[in-house]
């Protein structure tokens, strides 16, 4: 089905494939696809109101008493069916109140603000919110501008709960930023948006316009537009309807402030009235054919002057499949609806209700916005919520705007549209989910623009169009290092060519089976036992504090008097010293180091060269006691003497540790013979041992300073 899109003031030039454009046949499916069935367009009822609707855009913010049943727009008059202007509340009648007491709850603040501001005028509602820093603020909505201005003057600087209030006119965001892959004319964008409510401003975005350097601002055709509504709930309803179409980019933007001549809604009042009378959509009797022909010829010249040439086959309404249908929301009826999210614009979700809530109370509260079809109140053990369905979209939008964050039974409610379906992932996607439009190529920012027009400043969207991500925060979802248990690790065998343990690492990567799949990064909270070029100073500091061992290249700066070691309060490490070396346990980590020392040793992550030196695995040393010297009798056949038969060799009694040392060690791994005094030489080979052999005046070489060891069994 080939569709021709009607422009507001001109006919499109025929496409390159030779299709003949029929100026009398205009199909408006591209506009009506975004509109629900119950929202009527500005049809023939307004064809004679064109000249009478030349109202200034500044007259939109007038008192509600002047238009109880109708709201005036620059394009005509839009009649409100189910929501009166008193219940909606104009943005000009809203006050922003800051500097509230953060110690109070939102419910208490809402009640106190209501009691304080209702004395200044007819109060409609009060909402209390908090920012990211947990600072509370409130929006106070009055029913007319006079009371709002009176409250701004009288309430400024007054005390409430021990705090001086700061009052300002509320900046109610009600502007949409619309972007399409095709260039859209001003009248088309106005027809699409004005059917959701009254409009204040329609301003083209100059940034993405392809005729930036050729023509002056403002232009009548662009790919992206700023549309500001009179009421926020109308903007919310338009946002919910248009955002579900994959060919549109709809963003909730901050309000724009441009001069009147940049507002095309104000400049084109006369053209818009001509459009309603002569575009052929309203008049079907042919009475204005001459006017149509003349206006079409003139508009065709204006279109060529502005470079406004668009193909008649629109990319988002084309298709040869007759079975392809559009829903009222403008979404293709695919078979993968489970993967997309839809908004039921007649139903609202009401959460955070009080446990005493009943259907009658909900009906009494929410029926003020429109006629209710159904109320589904659900009680959960920890949550109470309800789904309320209205007969019209206007009533649901008014309830969403009025009741969200409002007080009901002394609790703050949470109100939003009812969501149906899964995650929305169909933006710029084709019939079968394939991408048919490259957003970044087409909408790339162009340099050399000659006009500084309104810029897009995004604002938080009023409704949640997508589901929240489950799980923890981003920091919790980061890949963490594997946890290393605190316990003894088996010592791998040395390489074949290694002469001693000092010639190779304790656990090289090839011998570390438990470190498979370990990432080459290290968490800041975990100490490391490997050295990098940037951490040599840190390791040097540790070795100087711990004393090092006798074969260390860095001398110890700690005096010998401070070298007493308590074996019960530390973890010792394997090093290249023998079992009888008194310094074999000095290379350790001080478990009692304070926080400042920890920060010194382990600097920031940016100071480590991760990709320069591969990390060594973490190793937690097993606990063992110091070796003690005990002189034994003659060695039996199962314990041959390590020295000659004529030398007395004491047996080094070492407490066992798991696992036992591997067999087949090199000769350098065996402790060397220890020289003993000649007075004990005669004891070698005797049948009994004298008691004085175990006195403390032994002259062995293991402990030359006769340092006492505190053994904790």
Curated annotation (Swiss-Prot):
Residue runs in coiled coils: none
Family annotation (Pfam families): RRM_1 (PF00076)
GO cellular component entries: cytoplasm; nucleus
Function in brief: Positive regulator of sporulation-specific genes and of sporulation. Required for premeiotic DNA synthesis and meiotic chromosomal segregation. May act in a nutritional signaling pathway.
Post-translational modification: Polyubiquitinated by RSP5.
InterPro entries cross-referenced by the UniProt entry: Nucleotide-bd_a/b_plait_sf, RBD_domain_sf, Rim4_RRM1, RRM_dom, RRM_dom_euk, SRSF
UniProt keyword annotation of Repeat present: yes
GO terms, molecular function: mRNA binding; RNA binding; snRNA binding
GO terms classed as biological process: meiotic cell cycle; mRNA splicing, via spliceosome; premeiotic DNA replication; reciprocal meiotic recombination; sporulation resulting in formation of a cellular spore
Species whose genome carries this gene: Saccharomyces cerevisiae (strain ATCC 204508 / S288c) (Baker's yeast)
Disordered as annotated region, ranges: 1-90, 276-337, 524-609
Disulfide bonds: none
Compositionally biased tracts (Polar residues): 563-574
Phenotype for residue 139 to L: Leads to absolute sporulation defect
Up-regulation conditions: Expressed at elevated levels early in meiosis. Expression depends on IME1.
Name the record gives this protein: Meiotic activator RIM4
Basic and acidic residues bias: start-end ranges: 21-31, 299-327
SUPFAM superfamilies: RNA-binding domain, RBD
Gene3D superfamilies: 3.30.70.330
Keywords, alphabetical: Meiosis, Phosphoprotein, Repeat, RNA-binding, Sporulation, Ubl conjugation
Regions of compositional bias (Low complexity) in chain numbering: 74-90, 278-298, 526-546, 575-594
Gene name as annotated: RIM4
């Amino acid at each position: 089905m080939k569709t021709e899109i009607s422009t507001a003031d001109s006919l499109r030039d025929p496409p390159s494939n030779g299709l003949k454009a029929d100026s009398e046949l205009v199909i408006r499916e591209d506009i009506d696809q975004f509109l629900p069935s119950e929202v009527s367009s500005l049809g023939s009822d307004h064809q004679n109101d064109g000249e009478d609707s030349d109202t200034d855009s500044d007259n939109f913010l007038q008192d509600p008493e002047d238009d109880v049943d109708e709201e005036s727009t620059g394009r005509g008059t839009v009649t409100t069916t189910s929501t009166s202007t008193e219940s909606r509340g104009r943005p000009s009648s809203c006050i922003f109140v800051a500097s509230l007491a953060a110690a109070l709850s939102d419910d208490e603040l809402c009640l106190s603000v209501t009691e304080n501001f209702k004395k200044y005028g007819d109060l409609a509602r009060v909402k209390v919110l908090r920012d990211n820093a947990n600072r509370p603020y409130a929006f106070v909505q009055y029913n007319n501008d006079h009371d709002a201005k009176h409250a701004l003057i009288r309430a400024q600087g007054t005390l409430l709960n021990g705090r001086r209030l700061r009052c300002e006119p509320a900046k109610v965001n009600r502007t949409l930023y619309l972007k399409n892959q095709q260039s859209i004319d001003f009248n088309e964008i106005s027809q699409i948006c004005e059917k959701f409510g009254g409009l204040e401003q329609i301003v083209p975005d100059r940034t993405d316009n392809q005729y930036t350097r050729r023509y002056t601002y403002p232009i009548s055709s662009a790919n992206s537009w700023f549309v500001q509504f009179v009421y926020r709930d109308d903007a919310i309803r338009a946002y919910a309807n248009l955002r579900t179409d994959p060919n549109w980019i709809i963003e909730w933007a901050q309000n724009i402030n441009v001069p009147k001549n940049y507002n095309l809604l104000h400049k084109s009042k006369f053209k818009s009235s001509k459009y309603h009378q002569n575009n052929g959509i309203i008049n079907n009797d042919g009475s204005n054919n001459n006017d149509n022909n003349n206006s079409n010829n003139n508009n065709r010249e204006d279109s060529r002057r502005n470079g406004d040439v668009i193909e008649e086959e629109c990319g988002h309404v084309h298709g040869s499949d007759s079975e392809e249908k559009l829903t009222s929301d403008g979404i293709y009826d695919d078979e993968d609806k489970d993967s997309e999210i839809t908004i039921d614009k007649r139903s609202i979700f009401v959460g955070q209700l009080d446990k005493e809530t009943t259907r009658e109370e909900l009906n009494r509260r929410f029926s003020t916005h429109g006629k209710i079809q159904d109320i589904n109140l659900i009680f959960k053990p920890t949550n109470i919520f309800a789904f309320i369905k209205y007969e019209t979209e206007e009533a649901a939008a008014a309830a969403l705007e009025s009741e969200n964050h409002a007080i009901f039974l002394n609790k703050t409610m949470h109100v939003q549209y009812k969501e149906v379906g899964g995650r929305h992932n169909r933006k710029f996607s084709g019939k079968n989910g394939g991408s048919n439009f490259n957003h970044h190529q087409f909408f790339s920012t162009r340099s050399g623009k000659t006009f500084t027009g309104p810029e897009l400043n995004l604002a938080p969207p009023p409704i949640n169009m997508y589901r929240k991500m489950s799980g923890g925060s981003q920091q919790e979802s980061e890949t963490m290092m594997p946890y290393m248990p605190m316990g003894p690790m088996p010592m791998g065998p040395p390489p074949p060519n290694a002469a001693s343990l000092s010639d190779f690492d304790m656990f090289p990567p090839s011998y570390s089976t438990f470190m498979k799949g370990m990432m080459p990064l290290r968490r800041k909270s975990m100490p490391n036992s490997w050295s990098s070029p940037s951490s040599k100073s840190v390791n040097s500091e540790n070795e100087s504090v711990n004393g090092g061992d006798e074969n260390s290249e860095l001398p110890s700066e700690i005096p010998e008097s401070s070298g007493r070691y308590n074996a019960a309060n530390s973890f010792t490490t394997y090093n290249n010293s023998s079992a009888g070396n008194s310094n074999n346990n000095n290379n350790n980590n001080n478990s009692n180091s304070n926080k400042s020392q920890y920060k010194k040793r382990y600097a920031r992550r940016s100071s480590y060269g991760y990709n320069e030196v591969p990390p060594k695995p973490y190793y937690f040393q097993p606990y063992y006691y110091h070796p003690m010297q005990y002189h034994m009798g003659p060695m039996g056949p199962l314990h041959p003497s390590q020295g000659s038969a004529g030398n007395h060799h004491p047996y080094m009694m070492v407490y066992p540790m798991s696992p036992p040392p591997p067999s087949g060690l090199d000769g350098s791994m065996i402790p060397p013979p220890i020289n003993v005094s000649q007075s004990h030489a005669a004891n070698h080979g005797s049948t009994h041992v004298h008691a004085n052999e175990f006195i403390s005046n032994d002259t062995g070489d293991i402990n030359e300073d006769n340092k006492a060891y505190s053994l904790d069994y």
